[in-house]
Amino acid sequence: CKPCESWWTEAQLKDGKCPDCGGPVYEAEEEAYFFKTSKYADRLLKYYDEHPDFIQPATRKNEMIAFIKQGLQDTCVSRTSVSWGIQVPFDPKHTIYVWIDALSNYITALGYDNDTYHDFDKYWPADIHMVGKEILRFHTLIWPAMLMALDLPLPTKVFGHGWLLLNGGKMSKSKGNVVDPVKLCDRYGVDAVRYFLLREVPFGNEGAFTNEALINRINTDLANDLGNLLSRSVSMVEKYFGGTLPAEREADPMDEELVGMISSLRAKYEEQMEQYAFQNALTEVFKVISRTNKYIDETAPWALGKDESKKARLASVLYNLLESLRVCGPLPSPFMPPSAEKIAEQIGASKEDMSYESPGRHGVPPAGATRHQGPPRFPRTALTKEIAQLEDPHA
């Protein structure tokens, strides 16, 4: 298969086409050197069994096990029909097969077997290789076998993520069925697009992209839930206390559920992140955001604000809202870094208050911090109008 630069036997083809990309294949015959990958079949299976998390997600591991058990073929490592590339040192008629060259770069770029770089001992073995599912075979069969042959340690984990599909098929520049990410980022902001991609699709699986799903996710999660919570919280602090909460506060048993969720959020978030379950990690954050919005309805701060004797209680309610934002703000910063910074500015939190360590503690910011209202971070958009705009080829 020319686009994939892969060699296949007739038995490996799927309906006579490339099993990876579905494209046409061509019969080819040329002199080549081979790496005896088949020698490592049993050793690879044993390694998978002893290191069950080596290939992620688990469905990908099952695919690789099945591939080996049907008969692992030796790997062609040189070409004579291609002139560009690195020459085989002992036979200049041959150039090194591009994937052998590419895979070896993981260690040679760190200094393995050369005097140019000196970071091999520091950085190898890698904690994780993050690759597309279409090149998983190279990273979990050929590459580990090469490392075994060199008596070198394997990377700790290889994660093969799925494709983002459009109209049921893989996006392809050659087919013209692609979504312009620059256009989306210019229109909605890179944070919103990044959030959608990681929240909408379980990482590692296939996911369908539609303009409607993008806009609905932005409107529901970012504009309605997070954006509205930020706007309401800061505006009430400004309205009732001039932007600065007093030190005197009055807690109530109805605060306990929300405070408990805020305090336990970081541990739940970390658990999902460690498993590369980014969708679940963000879901945990937005559970707290949703509960905080419900807490506003339960405590009715607008009613408390009308009674001077309940100012301390009002201060406590608003403080809990700001605490929720302070804790929920930095956790999604790997997905939405500018948004985390903007939230910090509006709720009057310092860099230390918004550090990654701070979500593990409740009651961090001082009472005297000043909050100020800013422009909507995620403006709500009209679904029909936005879809028409996105589907307009001249827009």
Segments from the language model and where they lie:
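Basic, alpha-helical terminal appendages of large translation-related enzymes
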Residues: 12-16, 20-21, 271, 276-277, ...
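A glycine-rich phosphate-binding loop feature that marks nucleotide/adenosyl-phosphate handling sites
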Residues: 1-3, 162-164, 213, 248-253, ...
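Short, glycine- and charge-enriched coil/turn segments that flank and shape catalytic ligand pockets
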Residues: 14-16, 50-51, 91, 114-123, ...
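Alpha-helical scaffold segments in carbohydrate-active enzymes
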Residues: 102-105, 225-236, 261-264, 268, ...
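Cys/His-rich Zn2+-binding cysteine-cluster or related metal-binding knuckle/ribbon modules and their
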Residues: 1-12
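Active-site-proximal binding-pocket segments
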Residues: 136, 197-200, 204, 210-213, ...
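Intrinsically disordered or highly flexible coil/loop and linker segments, enriched in small
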Residues: 53-54, 73-74, 81, 152, ...
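Structured secondary-structure scaffolds
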Residues: 3, 17-239, 281-285
